[in-house]
Amino acid sequence: MVRTLDSPRHEALRTFLIERRNKAGLRQVDLAKRLRRSQSYVTYVETGQKLVDVVELMEWADAIGFDANEAIKRLSRTPKR
């Protein structure tokens, strides 16, 4: 069984979050401040060392300025394996 952290969908989510952060012109430390989290939290998510749940995805969306549904739609088009 494929570990969740290594799944194509998780990779797609990480890529999406990094793209959105960069598009917003935010550094990891800037996003961390908006999320009221540490920079290491952002790093762990972006490097696949930590999963984000739906609530966290919504927090990232609010902090960066994107629609969380857009991320979910993108993930739904990504193969499971």
Label for each model-derived stretch:
Residues 35-52:
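Recognition helix of helix-turn-helix/homeodomain-like DNA-binding domains
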Residues 23, 49-52, 63:
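Helix-turn-helix/winged-helix DNA-binding modules
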Residues 1-23:
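A short, Lys/Arg-rich alpha-helix, primarily the initiator
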Residues 15-34, 59:
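Short basic helix-loop element that most often maps to the first helix and adjoining turn
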Residues 2-3, 70-81:
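Short, charged recognition helix plus adjacent turn
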Residues 36, 55-71:
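DNA major-groove recognition helix of helix-turn-helix/homeodomain DNA-binding modules
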Residues 4, 8-12, 51, 55, ...:
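Residues at secondary-structure transition points
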